[in-house]
A protein has these predicted regions:
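N-terminal interaction/assembly modules
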Residues: 1-61, 122-133
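Residue-level detector of well-ordered alpha-helical segments, enriched
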Residues: 9, 66-70, 109
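Short helix-coil-helix linker/hinge
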Residues: 59-70, 77
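A short glycine/small-residue-enriched secondary-structure motif
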Residues: 71-73, 88-89
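A short structural micro-motif
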Residues: 76-78, 116
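Helix-turn-helix DNA-binding module
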Residues: 78-104
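DNA major-groove recognition helices of helix-turn-helix
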Residues: 95, 102, 106-124
């Protein structure tokens, strides 16, 4: 899979997580797991949502609140429309201006979140494969 395709797939997972209402901070982990189980039909979709949740938890535990804020501001746009060419860059620019930081800083935070997601997703898939044996 090409790098751009993988990036787009990860962004779709983050956006779906928000669209399903799983970004609600008042939900307990058990409620989130139950909601994922109820809302996601395929095993792949469940793994994607669990990976997003685990990414956010890991970032929160590492006190990377600025990265979580970037994810929520840029990826958790609950509008149902498909992303157009400049949606993400517009949201990044807006967030950079709000936080008085450089756009590259926001992009680095988002890249870090995608890398964490990718590693978590790979590990969860390996664990699931082992359980299926």
């Amino acid at each position: 899979m090409q790098k751009a395709d993988k990036r787009n797939e990860i962004i779709r997972s983050f956006r779906k997580f928000a669209r399903l209402g799983l970004d609600n901070e008042l939900l307990s982990p058990i409620q989130i797991y139950k909601k994922i189980d109820f809302l996601c039909i395929s095993k792949r979709s469940r793994l994607d949502m669990l990976s997003v949740y685990d990414t956010l938890r890991l970032l929160w535990l590492n006190d990377e609140k600025s990265t979580i804020e970037a994810i929520k501001s840029v990826y958790f746009d609950k509008k149902a429309h498909r992303l157009t060419k400049h949606d993400i860059s517009t949201q990044v620019l807006s967030l950079a201006q709000e936080n008085h930081c450089d756009e590259r800083t926001i992009y680095r935070r988002l890249e870090r979140a995608r890398q964490i997601y990718e590693k978590i997703r790979e590990r969860e898939e390996l664990l699931l494969d082992e359980l299926d044996r």
